[in-house]
């Protein structure tokens, strides 16, 4: 009678889970959260988060086939990232029929290798109390705004993402970016720059 009846949310690396883990997870009320960040090896290497994409794909298919709720999170604003490479990461997630895709802006934590090397990539941060990377040598601020719009359209369509990338991008162009999703005081600082956003 004292069995746990709640729901578990477990953060996992997709390439690290085993068939045994998937078997037992399928017997629980569980949601798996996979921090993918990016499908691109150069971007992953820059933040010490390279993925074995073959294994990632195999395991996500197994999780889906087992009927386990799951989501994938990615990051925009990564070193060496571009608008095009970010879109390719999103396209991969859509092709895998991930039910919930979440895209978060990169925050540089003080003392990390990425923060120490930020000038190597020309990373520029916003000027608020919880700064995020908004520009680099490989993406402009306008590119970042368009990545933010894609992030917003993913938020707006959770559990019902369009199957086609083109439809998601169209929704992104129509989205109003809610910057305060990530930090409560960002809206007043960052929202005026949305006037600079361009269509993809």
What do the PLM-derived regions correspond to, one by one?
Residues 1, 48-51, 88-89, 115-122:
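Short secondary-structure boundary/capping segments
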Residues 77, 104-111:
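Short, solvent-exposed turn/loop segments enriched in Gly/Ser/Thr/Pro and often Arg
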Residues 144-200:
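Radical SAM enzyme core and accessory elements
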Residues 119-163:
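Alpha-amylase-like alpha-glycosidases and glucanotransferases acting on alpha-linked glucans and related
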Residues 1, 84-99, 158-176:
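Short, electropositive alpha-helical surface patch
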Residues 25-39, 99-107, 117, 123-126:
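Non-cysteine beta-strand/loop elements that form the S-adenosyl-L-methionine
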Residues 1-71, 76-78:
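Conserved SAM/AdoMet-binding glycine-rich loop
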Residues 19-25, 79-97, 143, 147:
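Catalytic cores of alpha/beta
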């Amino acid at each position: 009678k004292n069995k746990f009846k709640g729901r578990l949310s477990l953060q996992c690396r997709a390439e690290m889970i085993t068939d045994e883990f998937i078997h037992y997870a399928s017997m629980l009320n569980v949601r798996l959260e996979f921090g993918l960040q990016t499908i691109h090896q150069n971007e992953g290497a820059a933040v010490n988060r390279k993925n074995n994409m073959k294994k990632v794909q195999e395991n996500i298919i197994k999780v889906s086939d087992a009927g386990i709720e799951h989501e994938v999170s990615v990051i925009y604003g990564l070193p060496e990232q571009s608008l095009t490479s970010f879109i390719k990461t999103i396209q991969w997630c859509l092709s895998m029929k991930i039910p919930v895709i979440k895209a978060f802006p990169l925050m540089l934590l003080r003392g990390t290798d990425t923060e120490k090397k930020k000038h190597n990539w020309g990373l520029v941060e916003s000027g608020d109390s919880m700064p995020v990377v908004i520009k680099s040598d490989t993406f402009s601020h306008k590119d970042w705004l368009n990545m933010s719009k894609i992030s917003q359209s993913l938020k707006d369509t959770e559990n019902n993402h369009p199957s086609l990338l083109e439809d998601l991008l169209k929704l992104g162009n129509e989205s109003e970016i809610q910057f305060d999703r990530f930090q409560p005081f960002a809206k007043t600082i960052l929202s005026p720059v949305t006037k600079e956003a361009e269509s993809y």
